[in-house]
Regions:
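Short amphipathic alpha-helix with an adjacent loop that forms part of the alpha/beta core around
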Residues: 173, 410-419
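Residue-level signal for inorganic ion chemistry
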Residues: 9, 43, 62, 92, ...
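Short acidic-hydrophobic, aromatic-tinged amphipathic segments that line or gate anion-handling sites
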Residues: 80-84, 401-411
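Acidic, Mg2+-coordinating active-site environments of NTP-dependent enzymes
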Residues: 9, 13, 72-76, 181-322, ...
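Active-site beta-alpha connecting loops in nucleotide-dependent enzymes
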Residues: 51-53, 60, 309, 328-401, ...
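Phosphate-binding loop of NTP-binding sites
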Residues: 88-218, 223-228, 440-450
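N-terminal leader/targeting and accessory segments in enzymes
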Residues: 1-91, 95, 343-347, 351, ...
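ATP-dependent carboxylate/acyl-activation modules
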Residues: 107, 310-313, 431, 435-437
Length: 451
């Protein structure tokens, strides 16, 4: 493992350095962190200016967490003083990227990018960006960590998430992917990105930036600029090559992959979770892994054993109840997919559905469409949560038991009315806080078992 000492940093940053720390004898750093919550002992803390303060305000917390030293554009006895901390961090990220000789895969899309990143990382034994960390500062820290810890040939898979125009170009300038994956184009983050054409334009930049391989999921293909079709590989369940057949009941994926010589490779596996979205992500991971030199059998074994990110269609068996936790995010396309997964689970089925945020002017109609979708579903009951979901509640008619709560606190007070057998989906935008409901139900079950 390499370390970053002050001399090395000065050599890399050049005239961006203003002064060395006043405190002498500081140890070399094992990496960088721009947020104290992500700081590991031995890393240097990069104190950035923010909308509500400066990172140096948290210097004591960083030191208590074990920071080797600080990098800041404001004076501190243990800080390497630079002209602009954000610019210095970006420079270090670009330097780290230049040291890599292995593939760097950028993964983006309106839905499915985190799961695809996770499975692709497993299939290729790659380092992956943690969680859904997508800011330039955080990704610069990921690049530096990979440079210091990994062999330069090890694959690196980075999630590229954006919610406004111009962000993708900034991320791509830093990450410079050799391979690009576009999972889906759908209505998400419309407030900052614009309409669906704007989403497609921004997301597809990852393909333009990737010289060695371009992979496009079935849900993105129709929205893609036709000029990119010839240079991109379309991947989806159904016909074509590559493609796959998915048995939802058995969680079995039977994949047909395209070999580099144009031939076919076949492999079957049991997926580590539920639903067609997971099967689609696995298919992409298997194809990219094959192109990166991993045998289909080994890639399939790794995908089958992958540990998925929490709160993405995560199933919990609570006695007679299967709780489907999809409380991390929500958009029209992911709501439909989650309801499809719920439909394959044991009856009686019910759902708790929160607001789909950041849809801009589409919010009213999108929630009305969700209500119509729920009305047609085979559900014993549905609980809507949040002000925007009121429209979905009003559009839900028929035989369902239906409820609306203005916020998660109100539902938590009434959670005794939720079903305790069959299957229950809980899904909504993260800001609604439905993860609190999931945790409350899990804790309730744990107490029941303990007693």
């Amino acid at each position: 493992m390499q370390r970053l000492d002050l001399d090395s940093l000065c050599a890399i940053l050049g005239d961006q350095v203003v002064a060395l720390p006043l405190e002498r004898g500081l140890p070399p750093a094992t990496g960088l962190a721009s947020h104290t919550d992500h700081l590991r002992p031995g890393e240097a803390f990069v104190a950035l200016a923010g909308a509500h303060g400066h990172g140096l305000d948290h210097a004591a917390r960083a030191e208590a967490a074990g920071a080797a030293f600080l990098i800041s554009d404001r004076p501190h006895p243990r800080a390497l003083l630079v002209r602009d901390a954000a610019a210095a961090l970006a420079h270090l990220g670009r330097h780290a990227r230049e040291q890599r000789r292995g593939p760097v895969v950028g993964v983006t899309g309106s839905v499915g990018k985190t799961t695809t990143k996770t499975l692709l990382g497993a299939a290729t034994a790659a380092r992956t960006s943690p969680g859904n960390i997508n800011t330039p500062a955080a990704l610069a820290c990921v690049l530096v960590h990979a440079w210091l810890v990994d062999a330069p040939e090890r694959p690196l898979v980075i999630e590229l998430g954006i919610d406004r125009r111009g962000e993708m170009a900034t991320l791509l300038e830093l990450v410079r992917p050799s391979h690009g994956v576009l999972t889906a184009i759908a209505e998400a983050h419309l407030e900052g990105l614009g309409d669906l054409r704007d989403v497609a334009r921004e997301k597809s930049l990852v393909l333009h930036a990737a010289p060695a391989g371009r992979y496009v999921g079935e849900q993105a293909w129709a929205s893609l600029d036709p000029a990119l079709h010839a240079s991109s590989l379309r991947i989806g369940l159904g016909d074509g090559l590559p493609s796959g057949r998915f048995d939802a009941a058995q969680r079995q994926l039977h994949a047909r992959l395209r070999r580099p010589d144009g031939g076919e490779a076949h492999v079957s596996l049991t997926l580590p979770g539920l639903g067609a979205p997971l099967a689609q992500a696995a298919l992409v991971a298997l194809q990219v892994a094959l192109d990166l030199g991993v045998t289909p059998r080994l890639a399939a074994e790794r995908v089958a054993a992958a540990r998925l990110e929490p709160r993405r269609l995560q199933a919990h068996v609570l006695g007679p109840l299967t709780l489907l936790d999809d409380a991390y995010n929500a958009s029209p396309v992911s709501m439909r997919a989650a309801l499809d997964v719920l439909a394959a689970l044991p009856a009686p089925r019910a759902a708790v559905l929160g607001d789909m945020r950041e849809l801009g002017s589409r919010s009213h109609d999108a929630h009305a469409e969700l209500g119509a979708l729920v009305a047609a579903a085979d559900l014993a009951g549905v609980w809507f949560v949040g002000p925007e979901s009121r429209r979905a509640f009003e559009a839900t008619t028929g035989r369902h038991e239906r409820h609306h709560h203005p916020d998660v606190e109100a539902l938590l007070r009434d959670k005794a009315g939720l079903p305790r057998r069959g299957s229950l989906l809980i899904k909504g935008s993260r800001s609604i806080g439905l993860d609190r409901l999931v945790d409350a139900l899990l804790a309730e079950h744990a107490l029941t078992v303990a007693s």
